[in-house]
Amino acid sequence: MAQKLWEKNVQVDHEVDEFTVGKDRELDLYLAKYDVLGSMAHITMLESIGLLAKDELDVLLKELRSIYALADKGEFIIEEGIEDVHSQVELMLTRQLGDLGKKIHSGRSRNDQVLLDLKLFTRNRIQSLVELVKGLFDVLISQSNRYKEVLLPGYTHLQIAMPSSFGLWFGAYAESLVDDLRLLQAAYKICNRNPLGSAAGYGSSFPLNRQMTTDLLGFDSLDYNVVYAQMGRGKMERTVAFAMAGIAGTLSKLAFDACMFNSQNFGFIKLPDQFTTGSSIMPHKKNPDVFELTRAKSNKIQGLPQQITLICNNLPSGYFRDLQLIKEVFIPAFDELEDCLRMVTHMMREVKVNEHILDDDRYALMFSVEEVNRRVLAGIPFRDAYKQVGLEIEAGKFIPDKNVHHTHEGSIGNLCNDQITSMMQDVIKSFSFGRMNEAEKKLIQG
């Protein structure tokens, strides 16, 4: 078994080793690229303060770029007996460069390394989420504009209520995604601050230049207080998880609507046959499994903030191994949410709308408010008009006028999709992805 970075003259018990390492070797593969990027920035800073010579820096950077290329191609592995990605990278450097590889850890702890890795990983995955949310948003706005004239029943308490439209339905979920990205942007601001240099949570006696690594990695700012930088472990993940839960909540609700509207009892929308699954016993079945799985996966993601909260709950300041378990629920959640966004976008692009829903007389009563409003406009007090129409309904004499005349902002006749699109564009511009991408590219390419 390879010696741990921290082992001295006593080898750790095998069962203790297996238990404490847990799933780190598997999950740290997600962090490999970012661990290398962090090391590039750190050693560049070490050279600037005299802890590495220029020729040593050049040799280390060249080797780290080779390791980065392996990770980028998915060929990086964490060997048996190696605890984590940090240990594996240092081991690879030491094998290739001897004692020079042992110098990269000066002024650094695995505590601030993993903080940094998680932040670099998370901000890149946030960028992917933003792109996928924008893709779904574009489809929803397009469908809203395409079907803006097609009416469907609106419901309260699952009872037929008032006229709605597919323009409103698609557009509502588009605007919901705008607010979801606003929350994600707030989480991104917390994520995009540099913890490197906080070491084990109490700083270092080396004259580290933390602003330099902040600039090299394209962070917006620092986690200044070194104790708080360590306290941010769990807090950052929980904040991002709340934002992910917001997106998941939108997807879950949309998936429920789609399942319900696709059922034979509603028949508002239809999925292409190739987008449905069948039954082993009922030959007529065409099941909306994609939406059902999206609903379940999204509901699972909505529980993510609570999972992280319970792992961190009642921990004092400082580092504790409890925090390791956050990775097990946090890292895979990005894959699940991204999969849901891709599939819902794919489904919503191809959904077929029933343009003759209101030919069915069962929906006649949803025009009752329209009739009340017409009488109010003719001069009858609202409460009297309400009573007149109510009595006509009870007597079976109500005859609906199925023409609707809604003109105010955000209504059937004035969807404000251009304004909603403008809001989405403004939110996306508020992310500092350009600086992040440029900084990482510069480190990789030299």
Predicted regions and their residues:
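Short amphipathic alpha-helical segments with heptad-repeat character
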Residues: K119, R123-V130, K134, I141, ...
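Generic, well-ordered alpha-helical scaffold segments in large soluble proteins
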Residues: H42, E63, I67-L70, M92, ...
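A helix-coil-helix interface module used to build multimeric assemblies
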Residues: M1-G203, L208-T214, S221, T277-G278, ...
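Alpha-helical coiled-coil oligomerization motifs
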Residues: I141, N145-K148, K189-N192, C259, ...
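Glycine-rich cofactor/substrate-binding loops
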Residues: A2-G38, D99-L100, G267, M282-G446
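A general structural motif at alpha-helix termini
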Residues: L60-L61, L217, D273-F275, R362, ...
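Alpha-helix capping and helix-loop boundary segments enriched in small/acidic/polar residues
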Residues: H105, R110-Q113, H157-S164, L168, ...
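Acidic, glycine-rich loop-and-beta core segments that form the ion-binding/anion-interacting portion
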Residues: L217-P305
